[in-house]
Amino acid sequence: MANPDSVTVRKVETQADFKAFFEFPWKLYRDDPNWVPPLLSMRRHLLDKNENPSWEYLEGDYYVAWRAGEPVGTVAAFVNHRHNEFHNEHISWFGFFECIEDQYVATALLDTAAAWGRERGYNALRGPQSFTNMDECGLLVDGFARPVMLMPYNPPYYQRLVENAGLAKVMDTHSAMANWDILHEAGAVDRVNRIADRVKRSQSITVRGLERKNLKAEFELFKDIYNHAWEKNWGFTPFTSKELDALVKSLGSFIDPELACFGYV
């Protein structure tokens, strides 16, 4: 195992630093057939403190671990003030944790994130999370297959690195998957079809597709439904109006109105 003294964790302060942070996953996962790279534009928007509206209530820094002049890991240390207010907690977070299979590097990164929080008076570190619960969150510990959109993916060794660095599980979450054959075998498709038939026959339930000409109003309706439906879920924080505007901008151009439906009772 490498000498820990050869690992240096530095805050991202220059364009070159940011480039190393931004591009590191492509270096780490280049030989992993299950990794699905994010859209460059979406990752850039997510990390840009001037573009991502979530930074209205976030405070944080990015870090890169270096060895022999090469990046070997990344982490973001941040506080989500909106989460703390909504859940009456006093915690900081880590996210965008990516690391070679090296315990020294992982511990150095996570210790840096923990120290960042302690310096600001936060008594616990939680993660990984890509800023909010609406982004990728959680550490994959089982089912290392190609993920669907917005589901986290990481190498199996991450669990060992994180736990050996002193962190412990706070909550079990589940990653979604889309496999038509499994859904059929489980009878899920038949159940959905039966429910759909009952809805069609019902006089008290109506379903309509999204109206593209009123896109902003439709997304505002979605925000109200989403915030109400999820308000008691662990880790949830409500959408803000500016986050909704960003969602309209990112999804509005390619969303299929026939697949985005509203139900009324």
Spell out what each predicted region is.
Residues 2-50, 201-243:
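Short amphipathic alpha-helix that is part of the acyltransferase structural core
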Residues 3-7, 155-234, 259:
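Acyltransferase donor/substrate-recognition loop-hinge adjacent to the catalytic core
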Residues 46-51, 58-62, 78-80, 104, ...:
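Short alpha-helical segments and helix-capping/turn motifs at coil-helix boundaries
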Residues 48-64, 249-261:
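A short helix-loop-beta-strand connector motif used in the catalytic cores of GNAT acetyltransferases and
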Residues 64, 70-79, 262-265:
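Conserved beta-strand in the GNAT
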Residues 68, 78-82, 97-99, 130-132, ...:
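An acidic- and aromatic-residue-enriched active-site/binding cleft used to recognize and process polar
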Residues 85-168:
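Acyl-donor binding region in acyl/amide transferases
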Residues 117, 227, 252-255:
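Short regulatory alpha-helical segment in sensory/regulatory domains of signaling proteins that mediates
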